Amino acid sequence: MTETHNDPEELARRVASLSAQNERLAQILVEARSKIVGLQQQIDDLAQPPSTYATFIRSYSDGTADVMVQGRKMRLTSLPAAMVSTARPGQQVRLNEAMAIVETMTYDHTGELVTVKELIGTHRAMVVGRGDDERVVNLAGSLIGRDGPTIRTGDSVLVDLKAGYALEKIDKSEVEELVLEEVPRVAYEDIGGLSRQIDTIKDAVELPFLHPDLYREHGLKAPKGILLYGPPGCGKTLIAKAVAHSLAQTVGQGNNTPTDDTRGYFLNIKGPELLNKYVGETERQIRLIFTRARDKAAQGHPVVVFFDEMESLFRTRGTGLSSDVETTIVPQLLAEIDGVERLDNVIVIGASNREDMIDPAILRPGRLDVKIKIERPDAEAALDIFSKYLTPDLPIHPVDLAEHGGNAQDAVTAMGQRVVEHMYATTPDNQFLEVTYASGDKETLYFKDFSSGAMIQNIVDRAKKAAIKGYLSHGTRGLQVEHLLAACDDEFQENEDLPNTTNPDDWARISGKKGERIVFIRTIVQRKGEGKNPTPAKAIETPHNTGPYL
């Protein structure tokens, strides 16, 4: 009989148990060793001295590089030597305790914001910082493309003044407002009621681009600018956009390129946007506008610089009616228009409803050569404008369609005629104002005397809204002529209290009623169905010698 400890099966179990214990101990030992290595690495990391960062300038074939360290220019060794061969000027590099380059980093994203005043060659620029302090800085590699610098005069850039590098272009909201926008697709055919003015603009603007040889042969220059003046809401801005679009097409035809691919640019400048409390800031922005315009024009693109509300910026100098900031703003615009640098492919268009307040030096021939009055639409022009908004593709009420044999075009044409007849009728219901002139003569003005393209568009929009509400209420779809007539009456009633009776002479200039001075005004609107009396007359006292503030 054998002993238990000599049993082979028992020995095999003990061997297997000891092997498992050995494996567990080996695994624990490996884990302990890795933890010791990790802790040792942490100890080594904590014991390392802090790294220094520098700005890379240039590298050399021997593996050294020039860097700027805290305002000091130094030549250091790179580890490895080939690492700095791919670094670009202005880039950050990391240095070890021995002042050797051990790693290349990205560009710094913080610094001082300055404005580019002038580019010097392909790798430097003159910039203006706080307090008009001028500095010359190098351009980082991120600002230099294949064809040269990717920045231009007027751009805001981030600079590291200690290293002397411009690092990044920053798009400020102020500059974004002045960025050239592409021309909207507004054609002359989209404008109603201004055919005569459009013909005048075509002769003044398009002929020099279509027939430059004839102009040179006759010693004639293209006009530098156009002034569009007239009452509000009559299409001045719309015409300016159409001019830009037409110029782009004309230049495209002259270059034998498809007109759809021809890009024109329209820079819409609203006068109050440029006004700034800091002396010289408005003039700087005007220079920036024309610099951007010249850049695009030099590439063969036509550029329209449109000044809306022109009288707010370029008011007559020396009148004492404002803070007299125009004493320097007006000469700046004149310098840009008449300056040494030619404005080829650039045309200046100004729009104003108070052209009498614009400085005469701007309006003289040779600057704003063409002056076009945008008048209020008469009945024929109003019908043309209605045809732009009342189109056959609109849902028409079955009753109106039936009256014209189901022809949608005839139906909308008849609608336009009905509402125009209603608008331009000289009936007591359409009487608006009674004005008294300085001579004692009186004149009754009707709502038709104050119509505009914007008013006509608003009437159509009101009618469309009424048609939608009618469909939701009664389930009958379509636009009716009654909707248009009711919208016209609502538009008239809303305008009843709008005339400015405090200073009727200024109001008359803005509204387009020029002529003899108005001294007395009263509204005589008859409100239908309300039984209300006309607004009582109100005398107007015009003060004299009130000083420059009234």
UniProtKB/Swiss-Prot annotation:
Disulfide bonds: none annotated. Residues 528-550 are annotated as: Disordered. GO terms for molecular function: ATP binding; ATP hydrolysis activity. Belongs to the AAA ATPase family. PANTHER family: AAA-FAMILY ATPASE (PTHR23077), PROTEASOME-ASSOCIATED ATPASE (PTHR23077:SF144). HAMAP family: ARC_ATPase. InterPro entries: AAA+_ATPase (IPR003593), AAA_ATPase_domain (IPR050168), ATPase_AAA_core (IPR003959), ATPase_AAA_CS (IPR003960), NA-bd_OB-fold (IPR012340), P-loop_NTPase (IPR027417), Prot_ATP_ID_OB_2nd (IPR032501), Prot_ATP_ID_OB_N (IPR041626). Residues 549-550 are annotated as: Docks into pockets in the proteasome alpha-ring. ATPase which is responsible for recognizing, binding, unfolding and translocation of pupylated proteins into the bacterial 20S proteasome core particle. May be essential for opening the gate of the 20S proteasome via an interaction with its C-terminus, thereby allowing substrate entry and access to the site of proteolysis. Thus, the C-termini of the proteasomal ATPase may function like a 'key in a lock' to induce gate opening and therefore regulate proteolysis. It comes from Jonesia denitrificans (strain ATCC 14870 / DSM 20603 / BCRC 15368 / CIP 55.134 / JCM 11481 / NBRC 15587 / NCTC 10816 / Prevot 55134). GO terms for cellular component: proteasome complex. This is Proteasome-associated ATPase. ATP binds at residues 233-238. Residues 9-48 form a coiled coil. The gene is arc. Keywords: ATP-binding, Chaperone, Coiled coil, Nucleotide-binding, Proteasome.
